[in-house]
């Protein structure tokens, strides 16, 4: 018996990183996983794993989300993962950067929740997990102005949904990781003028002396998706290797 046997789980940004690790972990625990991403070629790599079906989805497009929701009969868990990390202070953040970050990091979650929550309410049970970050209202982080703003908004969204629908059997939590070794992190390191220095800068802020793995984050997500966490709702769950201490 798996910890997620019989559960239908939809997640976004499943083609790589935390999303991919979570999709694989969910499937190993017996869930039926519907993995979505905008990157069709990388998403297809998941199709070889039992229990996972894939669907191309741009989470910034309301029409696509609504069409997808109409195709889904039921779901038990919605995991909103998609996001973008902008590097810089408020002075480095142009309006287009601000708008893009807000659109992908916050509005996409609003659209997904609004589309799929009615199905959960109809079945009188549901579980929503949102990807936030320690770089949010949890901790002020240098050069993460718009990113931290969006992730603080995700915490607010999470608490609001949890409070509004707790009596209808809905749970909503968010995951707040520290620095995770993902393709996204490696891209950000390589984009800096001195990648080795950039990597060391990222490592310095982790008191454990290492990055988290995507698989470590995924195992927390398995717990939040399972009935083991039935009494947990409205919480920003921190997994940061002591960064916020």
From Swiss-Prot:
Coiled coil: none annotated. It holds the Pfam family adh_short_C2. SUPFAM superfamilies: NAD(P)-binding Rossmann-fold domains. Its EC number is 1.1.1.-, 1.1.1.30, 1.1.1.104. Detected in liver (at protein level). Optimum pH is 7.5-9.0 with (R)-3-hydroxybutanoate and 6.5-7.0 with 4-oxo-L-proline. GO terms for cellular component: cytoplasm; cytosol; extracellular exosome. It comes from the Eukaryota. NAD(+) binds at residues 16-18, 37, 58, 151, 180-184. It is an enzyme of class 1 (oxidoreductase). InterPro entries: NAD(P)-bd_dom_sf, Sc_DH/Rdtase_CS, SDR_fam, SDR_superfamily_enzyme. Substrate binds at residues 144, 188, 205. It is found in: Cytoplasm. This is Dehydrogenase/reductase SDR family member 6. It comes from Homo sapiens.
